[in-house]
Amino acid sequence: MQLSKHFTLKEMIKSMTATRKGIDNTPGSGEIKSLGDLCYEILEPLRAHFDKPVTITSGYRSEALCEAIGSKKRSQHAKGQAVDLEIFGVPNIKTAYWLQNNVDFDQLIMEFYDKDDPAGGWVHISYHESGSNRKQVLTFDGKKYTEGLPDMEWKGGKVVG
């Protein structure tokens, strides 16, 4: 099922853990609508800006899958409102800054950020169509959350961390 021009339901629900453990990761109609909103409001503008495919590393998670991976059963992933993503060839911090400055979102987290590894970690972003998006921006280094994104470092006109 196509959710938007470049994103399918299949890629939004793909989970190696669900496959390995035989967990049903099928969303309901409300979650599918939320995933579509996420595609149109966040993912399509992101893909258009960088003109590169966006890799969804984690999208929708059923409550059973959330439990299996130690996540909250009612996380925004379980509501179809959040994805974890990367863009091959684009430092994750650069992706996070672009999202912060260009789309409406509820929560943006630079996950497992390591300034010495621009390709390390991933970007978590959530959206809900209710109009009450918090615009919360956090960085998680593997131990603690801090408000905001780390400063980007530039060298030769490119982001290095």
Feature locations, PLM:
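Extracytoplasmic cell-surface/polysaccharide-interacting catalytic and binding patches
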Residues: 1-49, 142-161
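A generic structural signal for short, non-catalytic loop/turn and secondary-structure boundary residues
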Residues: 49, 78, 118-120
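Catalytic cores and adjacent binding grooves of peptidoglycan-active enzymes
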Residues: 87-161
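Acidic, His- and aromatic-enriched active-site or binding-groove loops in soluble protein domains
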Residues: 73-93
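Short, flexible, solvent-exposed loop/turn segments with mixed acidic/basic and small polar residues
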Residues: 68-78, 113-116
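Structural recognition of the beta-strand scaffold that forms the well-ordered cores
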Residues: 55-57, 82-86, 124-126
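Amphipathic alpha-helical interface surfaces
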Residues: 38-42, 65, 81, 91, ...
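Extended, low-complexity, intrinsically disordered C-terminal regulatory tails
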Residues: 44-70
